[in-house]
C-alpha cells in the first residue's frame, strides 16, 4: 500500500514547520511514522548534483525551463518516496513575487505528487506580522496586515484548484499564539 502524501503549506511566519515538527513528534510516540520533505530543499539537492547551483538562492536565477525540470525531478523523487512511507511535503501554496503570486505546485508538480491532502496552516495576519517582526534570523519581506490576509486568501483559492485537479481534500489548521498544541492536535488528526 502506498503511503499518504500530505502537502503542508502556509505563508512565511505562520509557524508551519513548528506545527509539522510537533505533529511528527506526537505521531512518533504513537508509532505512526512520517517523513518530512522540504520541496525547495529537494529541488536544490537535484540542482547541486547536476552542478547547476551551489546554494538555494542561485536556483531563482536559473532558466525557467531548467527550474521546471528541477521541479519535475523533485516531484517524481518525492512521489516515489511515498511508496515506502507516509510523506509530509513542506512547501508553499503560493510564492509572492514582485510580479504577482506564483503557484507553489504547478500542474506538472501536482501530476507527479497527486497529494491525498493539502493542509493550510493559518493564523490571524496580525499574529504573523508580529512573528515576522520578532524573527531576526530570517530575511523576510515586510508586509502589512492587508497583504498577509490577501496572501492567505489567495492560498485558499489556489489550494481549491489543487483539490479540483487531484481530488485531494483540504484542511485548514490554525496556529494561534499560545495555542500551538491545538494546531498540532488538528494536524495529528489529519495525519493519523
UniProtKB/Swiss-Prot annotation:
Q: Tell me which residues bind ATP.
A: 10-18
Q: Which residues form a coiled coil?
A: none
Top-rank lineage group of the source organism? Archaea
**One MF term from GO for this chain?**
ATP binding
Q: Which family does it belong to?
A: Belongs to the archaeal adenylate kinase family.
User: HAMAP family, per this entry?
Assistant: Adenylate_kinase_AdkA
Q: This protein is called what?
A: Adenylate kinase
Amino acid at each position: 500500500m502506498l503511503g499518504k502524501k500530505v502537502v503542508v503549506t502556509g505563508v512565511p511566519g505562520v509557524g508551519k514547520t513548528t506545527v509539522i515538527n510537533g505533529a511528527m513528534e506526537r505521531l512518533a510516540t504513537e508509532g505512526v511514522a512520517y517523513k518530512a520533505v522540504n520541496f525547495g530543499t529537494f529541488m536544490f539537492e537535484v540542482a547541486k548534483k547536476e552542478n547547476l547551483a551551489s546554494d538555494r538562492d542561485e536556483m531563482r536565477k536559473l532558466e525557467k525551463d531548467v527550474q521546471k525540470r528541477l521541479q519535475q525531478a523533485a516531484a517524481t523523487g518525492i512521489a516515489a518516496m511515498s511508496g515506502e512511507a507516509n510523506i509530509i511535503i513542506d512547501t508553499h501554496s503560493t510564492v509572492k513575487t514582485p510580479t504577482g503570486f506564483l503557484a507553489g505546485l504547478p500542474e506538472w508538480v501536482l501530476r507527479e505528487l497527486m497529494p491525498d491532502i493539502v493542509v493550510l496552516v493559518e493564523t490571524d495576519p496580525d499574529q504573523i506580522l508580529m512573528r515576522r517582526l520578532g524573527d531576526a534570523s530570517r530575511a523576510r519581506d515586510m508586509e502589512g496586515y492587508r497583504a498577509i490576509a490577501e496572501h492567505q486568501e489567495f492560498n485558499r483559492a489556489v489550494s481549491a484548484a489543487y483539490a479540483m485537479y487531484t481530488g485531494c481534500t483540504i484542511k485548514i489548521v490554525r496556529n494561534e499564539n499560545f495555542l500551538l498544541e491545538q494546531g498540532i492536535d488538528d494536524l495529528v488528526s489529519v495525519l493519523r
